[in-house]
Each structure stands twice: as structure tokens, then as C-alpha cells.
Amino acid sequence: CRYNPGGVFELGTDIMDNPGEAKFGMTKEQLFEAFAILKEKGAKTFGIHSFLASNTVTHLYYPELAHQLFELAVEIKEKLGISLDFINLSGGIGVNYRPDQEPNDIALIGEGVRQVYEEVLTPADLGQVKIFTELGRFMLAPHGILVTKVTHKKKTYRTYLGVDASAVNLMRPAMYGAYHHITNMMNPDG
């Protein structure tokens, strides 16, 4: 079941996202009710999932999300007698799109999740719970490249370069102003 804790998800003084505005997921009360019904109907495998932020560039996101979900797993066990089989931490680990940004350190993130696992799940006799992730952007984005060629140049009050690619090839900048670094392969240092 997908859990939506509601409210605003913050790390320190930074607002990461606003789960309370999302249509996805269940409240804690809805999740407990759903699990009780599933248990009564004979379900044998249970898991939870949550998605609180996207493209976070901090090593604190996953450990904080893990802490919330691990505490919820303990509460599910105590109140419903259900030991979860898995917890899906979803995605959300971001990449450094700008050359001056520090990349996320996946080892540091993993260590943070491991510490929370041992602090919360292991003492509650939930040390067998599998942890899943969805690290598509983190794993693939650094390896995606759009190669395009300048086809013409136009000067008015500014200089414009026409290329043999369009928003169809890379929608994110046109759609919501996302930054993607450009390297001139004829002058990579310029």
C-alpha cells in the first residue's frame, strides 16, 4: 500500500515537497483499515511504499523517509500483528544537473538507511524486512546525452543558434525550465 503522510515534507529548513497536496497514497488510518481488511481476507504478503520528494540533492532524504516508514512498520506490527515483507523507499534521489553541484553520495545515503534500519526495525524483530528502491533517475540520468548540431545562426537583439533537435528530443527545459548543461564539443573548455 502506498502511504501518504500528508503535510509538508521538510529537511531542516528546506521544504522538499508537499505530500498533503498529492492525490496518491493513503492516510495512516486508511492504510491500517486496508491492511486489516487484507489480513481478514487472507493476504499473506504485505508491504508499504511512499514517495515524498523528487530529485533531492541531499544525503538526508532517504534516511528520513526510511525512518518514517520503519516507524510505521513497527506500528503496523504492534497494532495489527502484521510483519511487513518489504518497504519500498521509492525514488527521489537526485542528480547534479549543473557542473558546480556536488553529486549525491550513494554510499553515505545507504549507510544512513542502514543505521535507521538497525535502530528501528531490528529491535522490533523486523530485521527480515526487504528494502526496495526505485533509483532510475539516479542511475541513468548521468549517462544520457543529446548530441545535436548547429544548423544556422540568427542575430537580432540577441544571437540565436538553430539546432537539429527540438523539445521533442529534450522536453524538460521547455516544459518547466529544467537546466541541462551544454558542452560545445568543438571547444569543450570554452
Predicted features along the sequence, with ranges:
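Conserved, mostly hydrophobic/aromatic
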Residues: 1, 48, 89, 134, ...
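Active-site-proximal beta-alpha core segment in soluble small-molecule metabolic enzymes
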Residues: 1-86, 95, 116, 121, ...
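Flexible glycine/acidic-rich beta-alpha junction loops that bind and position SAM and/or redox cofactors
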Residues: 7-11, 85-101, 132-143, 170-171
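Generic secondary-structure boundary signal with a strong preference for alpha-helix termini
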Residues: 37, 54, 65, 102-104, ...
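Short glycine/threonine-rich loop-to-helix capping motif typified by GTGT followed
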Residues: 58-65, 96-109, 140-152
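Glycine-rich and small/hydrophobic secondary-structure elements
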Residues: 106-120
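Charged (often Lys/Glu-rich) extended helix/loop segments that serve as interaction or gating elements
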Residues: 118-121, 126-190
